[in-house]
Amino acid sequence: MYALRHAAFALAAAAFFAVAVHAQTAPAEPPAAPAPSPATPAGKTPTDAPSDASETQASDKDTKKSTQVVDKIEVNASQSTYDARQDDTATKIVVTSEEIKKYGDTQILDVMKRLPGVTVQNNSIRLRGLGNGYTQILIDGDRPPPGFSIDNLSPDLVDKIEIIRAATAEFSTQAVAGTVNIIMKKKFSVSKRDLNLGWYSGTGYTSKNLNFTVADSAGKLAYSIGGYGGAGTFGSPFRGDTIGVDATGVKILERVSTSVNDGGNQYVGLYSTLAWTLGGGDSFTMNPSLNAYRYNNKSNSRTIYVLGESTLYPISAGRNNGQGTNFGNNANWILKFKEGAKLDLKLNVNFGTRDNDSFSKSFSVDNVQTLERKTLDPSKDNRVSFAGKYSTPIVEGHALLAGWDVGLSRNAPSTILLETNVAAATINTTEDYTARVQKLAFFAQDEWNVMSNWSVYFGLRWEGIETRSSGTGLDVTKNRSSVASPLFQTLWKFPDKSGRQLRLALTRTYKAPDTYSLVPRVYRSTVNTSTAPDSQTGNASLKPELATGVDIAYEHFWEKGASMSISGSVRSLSDYNSRGTFFIGGRWVNKPINNGRATSRSIEFDAKFPLQVVLPQAPPIDFRFNIARNFSNVEEVPGPNNRLDQQTPLSGTFGMDYRMRGGMIVAGGSFTFKSGGDVRTSINQIRYATPKRDVEMYVLYKYTPKLQVRVRLANVLRQDTVTASTYFDAAGSTRFNSINPSQMNIGASVEIKF
């Protein structure tokens, strides 16, 4: 298969340019009305269905005026009755632009916190309590470029957000927990000139930021240009205690570690959308982006040995500096043909660089220098992909879609290490690595309305992956794997039109290692113990993690936006990716590994309703409630608590939002709970994380239609973060406990429209 990869690229490129020639030579004709889509409920027009992720929402100016009027009437009529969450066969929640802007949020992450089944933890978006690669994050159907931060994305530039709970063939099946697809606006009805200024102070961190948006149209061109920038300073104390016991339980080690870190960071970015409306309903869109960052950090640490022999490095001081840039561009060409057929072509390129350097010195208890270490870590990260899909309603009652996706990503890091150690020989090494991932995928899917209240979805996606790693002291390592993902989803509505319905989904998904996870770079720990080992970023032999899943849900929808759902899911995982600590070559090393089979089970309850549904004369307050219980176990790790690392076992959110009539004042708050406890990550290791409770509040005041102020409080309960790590074997155990103090976070922003 991989011997044909160059042919696949050539064929894809030929198809792209062949269609371009056809588009230039064929006369422009108004597109014919498409046949009804099976994903569209009975009695509705095809325009009721949501637009494609990358399709420009603009009428064709070459179409006759009378046709424009009819189209406008159809769209307006459908908007009042179509609900993607209730009507789509695929399990999908669509958050419209109106809902995104309803509460005046200035960051997409604030919008995400209100969405059913979504949790946000440390700026990471999670579904089913799983992040770290299990939840797929897409921008216009593509993975965001390296260095891109979603929290810098202005909600005003977002057309809608899709929460796809079960995988579909159209998108990559690298979505074990699900997919979050953020779709950007391609057309602006009015010109926009926005400026947002923000200030934020949190636990050991203070920042100032700004972002702006300029959007307008000129003839058949619609464009938007956005930018962001910011700077921050941080400084936080840290305390850790280490206790060691022998096989009989007698304490043989006790030490107390304290440290202070302080520094700062600066970042800046530009992103834009250029969308052309072409003849015959065609469109062409480009999304160039550029971002850059830099940071600096200084640290001082000291370890006091209460019991046990001191090492040569109880005192250390160091600095760490870094910078990076990334450039990317997405090109999207949509061509429409007769009878509703459509070809969608995408080309995506990204080029990124990172440069980090660190310098540290360590001293004995007598303040004699014992170690000096200097490390340089330059890296390059490049990606290119080309994808296409063809859809046609050629068969009545069916919506057929087929396509391909080819891609190449390459990561080339280097490590230059100079270490002078009084207890060992001087180290002066240069290590160069290269990791490459090639992907080839084909897919097809069909949606079918079997009856007026029953629809089904069939999909099949095949993805082949080849990884290649090489570098200093490392043999060339190649891994080839492929995943065939049959997918099935069905929706059945109760015939009494009560708003009740049932869903079922069967999926085959996977999580593939990225180029960063394949490069075995090692960052050396000064102390180097079983609880503070060297960190190896990657493993050249890492295999993809495969998952077979079943989802079932009962949903009930009422008028005025009230809804309730109960859902359950099971995921059976093989070649589960985790991290393990090993004693290799005289040093403790923590690295990623494949750790056998695992199973994850989840049950979730979600509800939201406006108070006016129950009390019509009540103030406009919206309530939302979500609780999720996640169970998991890893077969290769003995219990108890042998669950998936970083999965939240129990989480719950209760929130309310108030919007004054006219929208002058918007306010709200939420209480969030996330359980913690012990998790056994390997045969010899246990981690502990404290349960987290958080209260968050905000108020938005619209002084004028063009000026609004937003104030936000987070971490109101000021709960400290307590973590622990334990390593044990036949000789005894060592436990490291740490405490990070916490404080209330305060933020304020001013949004100005020109």
List each language-model region with its residue ranges.
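N-terminal periplasmic accessory domains that precede
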Residues: 108-111, 126-128, 175-197, 210
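Gram-negative outer-membrane beta-barrel transporters
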Residues: 451-456, 563-573, 589-677
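C-terminal beta-signal and adjacent terminal beta-strands/loops
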Residues: 673-678, 700-754
